[in-house]
């Protein structure tokens, strides 16, 4: 009986955590069908949007050196850390190949929509967690 109740509560919590209101279909042409409730267009062509987005280059480098020397009673530790971050954002409307500042790269986007999945999981955990703990204490 306890296992059945735990299974039922687990399924109910999972159902609450999954956002069933938005249906996404991604096919070979990168077309995405979205729900109008989220104020997105019904069909979005990701390839066209990628062409319109400004190119962004983010370069980050970090180096850390740690040296530890231990003798009988003496221990010496030195730590050196250096970090630099360079962010460059360029927006280009021309597609001429003679431009020397343009870089050709293909970017891949997993999802461009804000589905609120993390918020729904956090809300379900905030509500379902204490309920599950209370049920566990009662059983």
Swiss-Prot record:
Bilayer topology annotation: Lipid-anchor; GPI-anchor
Keywords: Cell membrane, Glycoprotein, GPI-anchor, Lipoprotein, Membrane, Signal
Annotated propeptide span(s): 117-139
Cellular localisation: Cell membrane
Keyword Glycoprotein: yes
Signal peptide residues on this chain, from the entry's feature table: 1-17
Main location: membrane
Name of this chain's protein: GPI-anchored protein 53
Annotated gene: PGA53
